[in-house]
């Protein structure tokens, strides 16, 4: 999360050694990924990196659309996995990533003075990093539907939000339904062989594709979508189609969640967390001092601790880690958690 109280120019750490190191590390990841695919990541064309950009993909209603970036599994990795495990779900493992503030497509970041220094965390670069982290999976990067001042991500299609992206959570906004439909339409547009079927609205829905599994990752502002999903779990389970979809979610990753609101950075409602715990989904929380040790936003750390303790008390499958705990809090390390988790 970019802190609104600061000048945008103060957020740009032009001379940061850590930023340079992080960008070089990302470049190394990109080279490794493209060596596996035989493709290039140089230049501004996402297609050159094996990335497919889908624009204005609709969700469950045509008023909610998102741009989506897809990186298919490297063919070599997929063949190796298929040979090792007969029931590898036919390459039907998927990872959905919700980015944070300032993260956008590379070309668009290059045009914005405040965003240009952070191009190594563009949607394309992060997609390549995630492909390295989750080999053999389809990587889906969901661009926020609005970017106020080209910096502040707003996930209005998933959760009621103000211009700066601060959420107002509810139990029935439709984030899960939108994600289910958005992913299905994206698969169809990308020409994947086993797409999710369209939502039918019937009480006896057809089965999902064999072996379909989903991991959902949120970073910084993107964690508001995961929080909204948690608040919707109880209601969504009453819907047969959404229940089938939720049953295929294997893991949720919160990466240094943050937003400009004054509370609810982490879910603390015990009933909502009870639904999450009973789902059996693996919960992973990775944080840095930038968010959980900021004295000006002390509630973030308190809420994070409450989130973890409540889930542990409820018997959830939860893991957590504080990264860079011996280093000063910095926005550089905030971004680097994407590499380290």
From Swiss-Prot:
Protein known as: Mitochondrial protein C2orf69 homolog
UniProt entry keywords in alphabetical sequence: Electron transport, Mitochondrion, Respiratory chain, Transit peptide, Transport
Function: May play a role in the respiratory chain.
Pfam family, one: C2orf69
Similarity annotation: Belongs to the C2orf69 family.
Transit peptide: 1-35
This protein's GO CC annotations: mitochondrial matrix; mitochondrion
Location in or out of the cell: Mitochondrion matrix
Principal place of residence: mitochondrion
